Amino acid sequence: MIVEGKVLKFGDKIDTDIIIPARYLKYTDPQYLAQHAMEPLDPEFYKKASAGVILVAGKVFGMGSSREQAAIALKAAGVRAIIAESFARIFYRNAINNGLPAIVLPGVTQLINEGDYVKINVETGEIIVNNQKVYKGRGITGMPLKILESGGLLDYLKKVSVQNQGGN
């Protein structure tokens, strides 16, 4: 699975309250949530991300309260993948379950800059920056990769259910 795009870069400890503020949690429409993603840090984030971007972030991306809407909002805004030094565990699972690749690359904030163009092999963790530099992040394999390739957990379960019933 290959994912690519231009980089938007953020720092350490981006919590779920920053990713999608609590006042929007009563809404379920992914496109509405997307319009408010990262709003406290960058009110123009939705416009920047809509072309399809890769987020680069520091340590413990997605920390704080558990809210699935954080991953939903980012993906709906146009985020194709996130590369971070580390992720909060619950955010990491929510990202995978919603079809949003989350790649760990220690030191990434020193290696990749805002505006760089990156190409990620999700399975191997290979990250190519500006068609020149190559870095090795932690790839995603096994069941998490199958979930991502299906578009998320619900799509994966639908696919498996159809296969188990003798369909395509």
Curated annotation (Swiss-Prot):
Can you provide one Gene Ontology molecular function annotated for this UniProt record?
Answer: 3-isopropylmalate dehydratase activity
Identify the enzyme class.
lyase
**One of the GO biological process terms:** L-leucine biosynthetic process
Reactions catalysed according to its record: (2R,3S)-3-isopropylmalate = (2S)-2-isopropylmalate
Question: What is one Pfam family matched by this protein?
Answer: Aconitase_C
> Organism's domain of life?
Archaea
EC id: 4.2.1.33
Protein family membership: Belongs to the LeuD family. LeuD type 2 subfamily.
Q: What does this protein do?
A: Catalyzes the isomerization between 2-isopropylmalate and 3-isopropylmalate, via the formation of 2-isopropylmaleate.
Q: How does it assemble?
A: Heterodimer of LeuC and LeuD.
**Name used for this protein in its record:** 3-isopropylmalate dehydratase small subunit
